[in-house]
Regions:
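Short strand-coil-strand connectors
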Residues: 50, 85-89, 112
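Ligand-binding loop in jelly-roll beta-barrel domains
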Residues: 103-130
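A short, N-terminal "cap"/entry segment at the start of jelly-roll beta-barrel domains
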Residues: 1-55
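Short acidic-glycine-tyrosine-enriched beta hairpin
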Residues: 87-103
Length: 130
């Protein structure tokens, strides 16, 4: 297992956009949005659903080790392969596979090649972890 780092997101080249792009009753064309992304690690809030948000991730590379003390985090792979590393194992998600990381669990995510995912999490979650 790779060594864990406890570093803030400012040290990483992540493009994280917390503004909500779509309101209720608006169609969301995820493939069109993903096709325009040029960043290697992109995270955009698409919409709000009750007290949660749906975020689009277009990623290649790896995120730092982190945890969310108060919130679960759900990942759903749309295209490519997305890996969720836990302290004791790694979970590889292919297209149309999902996985929930419970609150308080140390994890990191990575994608050896470009992948497209959706994330569902509490609207108040700190994307970089606690």
């Amino acid at each position: 297992m790779a060594q864990k780092q406890n570093v803030g997101a400012s040290a990483f080249p992540y493009a994280t956009h917390l503004n909500v792009l779509f309101q209720q009753l608006q169609e969301i064309d995820v493939p069109a949005l993903a096709s325009k992304v040029e960043d290697r690690w992109y995270n955009q809030t698409l919409c709000k659903v009750n007290e949660s948000v749906v975020r689009l991730g277009v990623m290649q590379g790896e995120y730092h080790w982190h945890k969310h003390e108060d919130d679960d985090e759900f990942f759903f792979c749309l295209d490519g392969n997305f890996i969720v590393d836990l302290e004791d194992r790694s979970v590889i998600l292919g297209p149309l596979h999902g996985f929930t990381v419970p609150r308080g669990v140390v994890h990191r995510t990575r994608a050896p090649e470009r992948c497209v995912i959706l994330m569902i999490e509490n609207a108040g979650i700190v994307p970089t972890g606690d």
